[in-house]
């Protein structure tokens, strides 16, 4: 393999612009092995072989991207582009987005090129399109439904007997959750409370739409209700804007939001040291192996007992790493704590996509998005435009962010429940175990609505939504410790 | 500039917390004139009054310096506002709160006989009582809010149900994924489904307040449409309606039925008041749409035994209308089908579609490796592996090649990523034969269908899944390619691998035992944790936490 790439180097050493490299590449088709299948046969690969080869290519490419060798990366990218396709089978689709992300990343090392290429690309920030994709995600996956159900249940239980309830929604994009809460409150034996919902979202239109739907429903149910829109990005949110008043019982709901606070500039330092390792890939290997070796045997046995995601690549490494301090997350959590909410419900992606090296993140995200794309494969026909939208505009963008961004730009810093628990605990919150009823309902939702293949695992009072054995999202409830 | 009345106040500010006694709060005329014994609510008023008697008087001046903000506690210990963190921001507020929530309702409206504890509330009500009318979309008028809500619940259920009906009949399994439909429509479906499910815990509360009406989130009925039999259809329909029940033990029963008797609900809907068929009832029900009261009350057979149905027809308010969440019915259908295969039980979480069941012949949820997910979409088409499965296979192959070629025992734990990593880096590294392996395995026909013939890095994978049945063993064995492992074992016998092999063999040979083994060890774990509890129980509860508990 190395030989092959060296061959490429030899032929394309004259070429300095991507276009030229491309042309020489297409003339001088690299062969997989000198004797066996030639490059043009790649198209004839069986899906499974193609899938494996795509994975292989992605990893090879990532190695080249990490070490910054454009030419080798380019060779791999070309093959990837031949095989990957956003409307092919699952692996082809995943590979298409990872390929784009990797290309994006290596292109960033040529800031001039990168900027020139993206200069005219006006970010088509179509609000309605964004809402539409979010809505499709809501429909195609049970994740938000389960999250909303568990969140509402936790709020209802915490607010038993309360007459003045204030709910803060840190991602006010989906009215369905609060419509459900309104109805649930309405059927409380002690009658509905005075309900105030504060929605935080950066787009005014979204909040307006939400306010309209909720006020309409509250009027229909005749529940005293007030919607308090806060147009702000979550990072710029001032706690004063939330207008929490004395005497009211406060609940906070955060759905897939907290991880954005982890974005920080301390990458600069980490990136530097990461680069050192990346230049020496075998070093990374060794380090990883070392990291695994202690405790892995014991943990493997532990896994036996607890049926704990047996093949999860992250379980071991996550626990052995110290929690990196994150000033912004901590100060935000502290600010929330200062409002002394009766309950705070947090939904997060349960994956470890915040590794310091590209390779770590690539591997972890490959597994996660493989599972997510598999979910779609079982539910939605391949030709569906909606499916492609979700894959491209939601997952594709996330992948791009995880793979090709660094520093403040890298916002999709998904972390495992374990780490979130530590953080939230440190901020002065105590875990509120999700009730039996909540879990029962969530399981029924999965069973009853055709979401086969999903599972809900209980992990120390929190819920982990899994696809098969792969944990995807976690829901946990908290309250102020005093 | 208009003064803001409701200045937001953050509760955690360093305000002075004041606890007043009930007597102080209830006192109407705390400030008494010593001459004429007239009482006043405020001292300022008394001072002004004293002027009339030519007594010395003094009005308090507004102090220029910033006064420390005060917050007031409710004296009632069971009240949420008894907690300092939930104190109320002003004196009038706490007084009214105390009257409203913990005081006697002395003021009664003559028109609707609603009672109020605070006179101003009563006054405000009296002004609007009778003038405000509640109009339902169906055209019916109500003067009282609760009758209106009762009506709305029924009326909504009907509207939603009739809107859903056509789709139910087609019984699309993917009902909640109406790709072709417009967003609004699917919006309603999806959200109401949540609603339906969010009610499922609610029936426990019903015995307290008969006047309460639960609104049905009938969206769950749509989910029920996934099943196709006619009884299922009925169940789905019925789920849109209210069941009447006055059975305090309803909760228990429901609980019980969650666990064991899911199936029996499915077809057994019993119509309490009408000899007509269920479907006819439905029809009639929808005809009665415009009357405020429904003419038929449906009941479930499991409730009928101890259920005296009150006359809901004439007075919907008096009746405790209970919504049995559609989720129950719908799940029961599901369980009905699944029990035969998986053995049922609330705990069996991952239910697999039937095509899986048939192909993989009695696989319980935990033990189905995700490789099988590939066959979910089209069981009859050529097998295509899911992306997850491909990644796993890649990881396996990576480990194989690294074992065979590097000669180094790369710590075969079940951490797939390290293996995958070595897969990637191995290729990048010195070994050309890695790729040879990769390509060889392509040509190896055994490798395409399943992972046969590949050394398994998931030595403990099978072991992870407790309680595999005998049937499944062959599956698992094929899957893990144990034969190959044994072969490769002889080549390189690292400790890890031996361990792995042992695990595999255990898994094969002592499968029946594995459950017991796990059980007994968890037993001992239980015991030890109990010991810990009894030993250090009181000491281990941290004081702040305890206080916290008490305060809520």
From Swiss-Prot, chain A:
Annotated segments matching region SAW: 404-479
Biased composition (Polar residues): 305-324
Known function: Probable transcription factor involved in plant development.
Keyword annotations of the record: Nucleus, Transcription, Transcription regulation
Region named Leucine repeat I (LRI): 52-115
Origin: domain of life: Eukaryota
Protein name: Scarecrow-like protein 3
Any one GO MF annotation of this record: DNA-binding transcription factor activity
Annotated region (Leucine repeat II (LRII)), positions in chain: 209-241
Gene that this sequence comes from: SCL3
Transcription regulation among keywords: yes
Any one biological process term the GO annotation gives: regulation of DNA-templated transcription
Family, as annotated: Belongs to the GRAS family.
UniProt subunit comment: Binds to zinc finger proteins MGP/IDD3, IDD4, IDD5, BIB/IDD9 and JKD/IDD10.
Compartments reported by the entry: Nucleus
Stretches the record annotates as PFYRE: 250-401
Region annotation VHIID: where it falls in the sequence: 134-199
Motif, VHIID: chain positions: 165-169
């Amino acid at each position: 393999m190395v030989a092959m790439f060296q061959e490429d180097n030899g032929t394309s050493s004259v070429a300095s612009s991507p276009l030229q490299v491309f042309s020489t590449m297409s003339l001088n088709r690299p062969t997989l092995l000198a004797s066996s299948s030639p490059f043009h046969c790649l198209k004839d690969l069986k899906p499974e072989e193609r899938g494996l080869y795509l994975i292989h290519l992605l990893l090879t490419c990532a190695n080249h991207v990490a070490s910054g060798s454009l030419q080798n990366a380019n060779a791999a990218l070309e093959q990837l582009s031949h095989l990957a396709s956003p409307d092919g089978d699952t692996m082809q689709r995943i590979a298409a987005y990872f390929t784009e992300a990797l290309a994006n990343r290596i292109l960033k090392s040529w800031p001039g090129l990168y900027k020139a290429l993206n200069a005219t690309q006006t970010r088509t920030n179509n609000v309605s399109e964004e809402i539409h994709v979010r809505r499709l995600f809501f429909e195609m996956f049970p994740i938000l439904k389960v999250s909303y159900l568990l969140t509402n249940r936790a709020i209802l239980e915490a607010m038993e007997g309360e007459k003045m309830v204030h709910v803060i929604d840190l991602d006010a994009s989906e009215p369905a959750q609060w419509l459900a809460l309104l109805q649930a409150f309405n059927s409380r034996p002690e009658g509905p409370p005075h309900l105030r919902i504060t929605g935080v979202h950066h787009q005014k239109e979204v909040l307006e739409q939400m306010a309209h739907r909720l006020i309409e429903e509250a009027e229909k149910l005749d529940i005293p209700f007030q919607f308090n829109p806060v147009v702000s990005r979550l990072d710029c949110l001032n706690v004063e804007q939330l207008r929490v008043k004395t005497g009211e019982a406060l609940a906070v709901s955060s759905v897939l939001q907290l991880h954005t606070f982890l974005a920080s500039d301390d990458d600069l330092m980490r990136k530097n040291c990461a680069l050192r390792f990346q230049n020496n890939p075998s070093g990374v290997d060794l380090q990883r192996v070392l990291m695994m070796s202690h405790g892995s045997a014991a943990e493997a046995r532990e896994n036996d007992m607890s049926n704990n995601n047996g093949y999860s690549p992250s379980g071991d490494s996550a626990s052995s790493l110290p929690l990196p301090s994150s000033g912004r997350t901590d100060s935000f959590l502290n600010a929330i704590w200062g409002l002394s909410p009766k309950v705070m419900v947090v939904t997060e992606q349960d994956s470890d996509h915040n590794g310091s090296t590209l390779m770590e993140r690539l591997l972890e995200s490959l597994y996660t998005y493989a599972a997510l794309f598999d979910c779609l494969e079982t539910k939605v026909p391949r030709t569906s435009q909606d499916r492609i939208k979700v894959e491209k505009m939601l997952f594709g963008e996330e992948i791009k962010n995880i793979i090709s961004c660094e520093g403040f730009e890298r916002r999709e810093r998904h972390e495992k429940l374990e780490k979130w628990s530590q953080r939230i605990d440190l901020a002065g919150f105590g875990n509120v175990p999700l009730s039996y009823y909540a879990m029962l309902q969530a399981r029924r939702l999965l069973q009853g609505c055709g979401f086969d293949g999903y599972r809900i695992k209980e992990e120390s009072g929190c819920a982990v939504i899994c696809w098969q054995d792969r944990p995807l999202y976690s829901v946990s409830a908290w309250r102020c410790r005093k | 500039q208009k003064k803001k009345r409701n200045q937001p106040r953050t509760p955690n500010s360093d305000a002075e917390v004041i606890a007043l006694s009930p007597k102080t709060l209830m006192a109407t005329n705390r400030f008494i004139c010593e001459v004429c014994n007239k009482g006043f609510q405020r001292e300022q008023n008394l001072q002004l009054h004293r002027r009339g008697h030519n007594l010395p008087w003094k009005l308090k001046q507004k102090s220029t310096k910033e006064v420390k903000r005060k917050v007031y506690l409710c004296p009632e210990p069971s009240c949420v506002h008894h907690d300092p963190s939930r104190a109320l921001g002003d004196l009038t507020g706490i007084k009214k709160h105390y009257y409203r929530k913990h005081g006697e309702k002395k003021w009664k409206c003559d028109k609707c006989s609603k009672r109020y504890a605070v006179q101003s509330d009563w006054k405000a009500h009296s002004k609007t009582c009778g003038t405000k009318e509640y109009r339902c979309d169906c055209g019916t008028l109500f003067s009282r809010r609760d009758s209106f809500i009762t009506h709305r619940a029924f009326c909504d259920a009907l509207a939603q149900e009739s809107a859903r009906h056509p789709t139910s009949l087609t019984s699309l399994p993917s009902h909640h994924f109406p790709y072709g439909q417009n967003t609004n429509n699917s919006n309603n479906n999806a959200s109401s489904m949540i609603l339906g499910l969010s009610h499922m815990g609610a029936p426990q509360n019903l015995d307290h307040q008969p006047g309460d009406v639960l609104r049905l989130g009938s969206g769950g009925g749509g989910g029920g449409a996934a099943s196709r039999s006619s009884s299922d259809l009925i169940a789905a329909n019925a789920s849109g309606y209210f069941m009447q029940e006055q059975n305090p033990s309803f909760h228990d029963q429901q609980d019980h039925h969650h666990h064991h008797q899911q199936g029996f609900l499915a077809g057994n809907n019993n119509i309490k008041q009408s000899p007509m068929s269920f479907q006819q009832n439905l029809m009639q029900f929808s005809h009665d749409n415009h009357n405020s009261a429904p003419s038929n009350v449906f009941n479930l057979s499991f409730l009928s035994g101890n259920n005296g149905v009150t006359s809901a027809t004439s007075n919907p308010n008096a009746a405790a209308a209970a919504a049995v969440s559609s989720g129950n019915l719908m799940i029961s259908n599901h369980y009905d089908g699944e029990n035969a295969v998986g053995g049922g039980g609330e705990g069996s979480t991952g239910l697999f579609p039937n095509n899986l069941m048939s192909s993989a012949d009695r696989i319980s949820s935990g033990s189905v490796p995700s490789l099988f997910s590939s066959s979910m979409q089209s069981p009859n088409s050529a097998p295509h592996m899911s992306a997850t499965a491909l990644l796993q296979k890649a990881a396996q192959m990576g480990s194989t090649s690294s074992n065979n070629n590097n000669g180094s025992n790369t710590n075969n734990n079940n951490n797939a990523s390290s293996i995958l990593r070595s897969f990637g880096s191995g290729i990048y590294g010195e070994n050309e034969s890695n790729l040879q392996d990769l390509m060889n395995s392509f040509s190896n026909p055994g490798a395409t269908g399943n992972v046969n013939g590949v050394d398994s890095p998931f030595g403990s994978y099978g072991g992870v899944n407790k309680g595999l049945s005998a049937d499944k063993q062959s599956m698992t064995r094929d899957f893990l390619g144990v034969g190959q492992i044994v072969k490769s074992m002889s080549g390189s016998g690292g400790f890890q691998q031996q361990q792995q092999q042992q695990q595999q063999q255990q898994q094969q040979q002592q499968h029946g035992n594995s459950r017991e083994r796990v059980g007994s060890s968890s037993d001992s774990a239980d015991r030890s944790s109990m010991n810990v509890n009894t030993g250090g129980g009181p000491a281990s509860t941290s004081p702040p936490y305890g206080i916290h508990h008490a305060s809520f």
